[in-house]
Amino acid sequence: MRRVTLHCAARLVIAALWLLVEVCRAESGAQSLAERVIWAVNAGGDTHTDVHGIQFKKDPLEGKVGKASDYGVRLPILRSSPEDQILYQTERYNEDTFGYEVPIREEGDYILVMKYAEVYFAQSQQKVFDVRLNGHVVVKDLDIFDRVGHSTAHDEIVPFSIKRGKLSVHGEVSTFNGKLTVEFVKGYYDNPKICALYVMKGKLEDVPKLQPHPGLEKREEEEEEEEEGEGPEGEKKSASTSPKNPVRSGPRTPNPYATDNSSLMFPILVAFGVFIPTLFCLCRL
């Protein structure tokens, strides 16, 4: 009888400890950013692995569509880490609309990240174009210089989802056939271009944020102070003078200390709840 009791107690303890280990592994073994990226290209450039481990492939349009340019390699790119400036220094442009096709086989929530830097023009309204995603306009009148200035990194971030054979983006829905087409649309001002881009599974908060832009932050703070100091009439005036195209350089970095670890408490309590009575029974035997 004692042997049977000891055997059962040991099995209970092992089961509780296994449950604890599995939960801890699930919490700490979440996919890294690089593992969630399903497709990445360094437009107009060669392969590159960035500081987050994302592996950008060589431009598949080389020799097929548009022209590659490395004009920006002579310039330092603000807001980008030194290791990843090459992603903003090279680019592909075309005198007409062009784009890339991204195969997507699984349903879920995705993010398209497009990297830009204006390395040629020194004023706004010189290069303006749209970006389409499977026919949906997701970026309208993109003027890189107007957004961030010269030789400065800028990321356009577009969340979308694929569910039940439908693509949903910016409140619009269309049939999805397994290929995501990202198009850079020729406008009235110069040629459309792209420096680098990638598609990843996840949410907006999963996208790495660019380094701060002092000029933009100062302008945003001044606008906030004006809005706080004015009444209803001032609010109307502030709204009319606000920039037409807000800067989209990525979501705010999540606070790592705000993570809820309550999911770990249950298996720990279970383990102790099983271990202590078992130990007590063993001592009595």
Curated annotation (Swiss-Prot):
Residues 1-26 form the signal peptide. Residues 284-285 are cytoplasmic. Residues 209-258 are annotated as: Disordered. The chain crosses the membrane at residues 263-283. InterPro entries: Malectin_dom, MLEC. Residues 220-232 have a biased composition (Acidic residues). A carbohydrate binds at Y71, Y93, Y120, F121, D190. Its main location: endoplasmic reticulum. Glycans are attached at N261. GO terms for cellular component: endoplasmic reticulum; endoplasmic reticulum membrane; membrane. GO terms for molecular function: carbohydrate binding. Keywords: Carbohydrate metabolism, Endoplasmic reticulum, Glycoprotein, Membrane, Signal, Transmembrane, Transmembrane helix. Residues 27-262 are lumenal. It is a single-pass type I membrane protein. It is found in: Endoplasmic reticulum membrane. Belongs to the malectin family. Carbohydrate-binding protein with a strong ligand preference for Glc2-N-glycan. May play a role in the early steps of protein N-glycosylation. This is Malectin.
